[in-house]
């Protein structure tokens, strides 16, 4: 799970199914994780006001809200690109966070070469294997390469690129020959290839065609780790995620289900609130 930390006002626990349960004080029950509700400020502007963000491990969540609500800022807080004036970010221990690089790849590197190079451990081990002379170290290198399934990496990188629209010949062309949109697809392929424990996506379909979008939907549905995604693509949010996190006026509300379910539930909630006034 991931949680924003700032000025604590309440404790919230997650049960094994990812349901939120309030506890004012004390340790969480056995088998539960703890997240906390905090206020978070960035450049003096309140992004979260006594709001909870807790994404259980392995869940796929769409982050929605009006333009300017702070969705992209929230992602940047999680990645560490921004630091809150008041508060901090905590992430599950040893969890790798992945997000698409803002700078599109260029130069002479091919798409498949760029994607493979994203796995710096694999690249480093392969380089060392060419020059290592100590038998023990050579054995360690080959064992580690086996552990990370390094020999299957080229085929996996090629499959991801193919899903995003690159045929076998295009995968070998220099990145400089592609338009900015296609180069952003390479950047997306690289982060998908890495399979981080927390995958952050900000409008990933902006540079995809219909075929690429449909492929991404299927890929995200079977992605083995946590996904937090900002998107205005209603179909994507209906088919690729299992929950919607709504950011409004500094408050975060988690809704189970896709975007249509979120809208229906939110309308009913607003109707009941008006009725009670």
What are these regions (language model features)?
Residues 45-274:
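ABC ATP-binding cassette signature C-motif
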